[in-house]
């Protein structure tokens, strides 16, 4: 049977992990992030590095949600029930901002994002800014971003993601906690596909 592209995309969204424990193949890393949520010891900037499709953006979203959760679990996961978690799930969160630098890499894009950093969050403790493919920012945009990164407001956390760590300026690297994501193993991929197949009632 031929499936159209829409169905593939819907499946990818349907099975995108929503908790740290459902992320495949990054156990050590997700444990460290959960511990940061539990202890409340959060850095102002994180850099998630690794090849495409290993869960960098997914983990950034889960982490952002957990940081702003009003009742995180004892394990450091977001509760999924509080107003902050619900707002995030319904894509109406005023505390979590995402920028895809692959298509929004001009100095204007970064400046408008940096304007948002000045305003404290209405609900919750932090404003979290996820910048995907951060290596794609223009040099002028990098410099505009660096000004805020050097002296971030107390209520701001940046989560940057990149597939090309070597293209990130050393001045930015030195201000981030760096997390290197593992490549997916064949075993992890097979076990995840079996899990999805079972849920979809597909025999294999």
Regions found by a protein language model. Name each.
Residues 1-178, 184-198:
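P-loop/Walker A NTP-binding region and its immediately flanking N-terminal helices
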């Amino acid at each position: 049977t031929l499936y159209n592209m829409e169905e593939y995309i819907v499946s990818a969204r349907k099975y995108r992990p929503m908790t740290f424990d459902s992320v495949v193949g990054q156990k050590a890393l997700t444990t460290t992030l959960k511990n940061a949520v539990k202890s409340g010891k959060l850095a102002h900037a994180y850099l998630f590095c690794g090849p495409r499709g290993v869960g960098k953006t997914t983990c950034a979203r889960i982490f952002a949600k957990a940081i702003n959760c009003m009742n995180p679990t004892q394990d450091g996961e977001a509760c999924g029930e509080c107003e902050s978690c619900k707002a995030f799930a319904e894509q109406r969160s005023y505390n979590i901002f995402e920028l895809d630098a692959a298509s929004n890499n001009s100095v204007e894009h970064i400046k408008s994002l940096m304007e948002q950093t000045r305003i404290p969050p209405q609900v919750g403790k932090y404003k979290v800014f996820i910048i995907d493919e951060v290596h794609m920012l223009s040099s002028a945009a990098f410099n505009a971003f660096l000004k805020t990164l050097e002296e971030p407001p107390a209520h701001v956390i940046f989560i940057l993601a990149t597939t090309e760590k070597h293209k990130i300026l050393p001045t930015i690297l030195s201000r981030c906690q760096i997390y290197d994501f593992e490549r997916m193993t064949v075993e992890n991929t097979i076990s995840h596909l079996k899990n999805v197949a079972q849920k979809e009632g597909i025999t294999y």
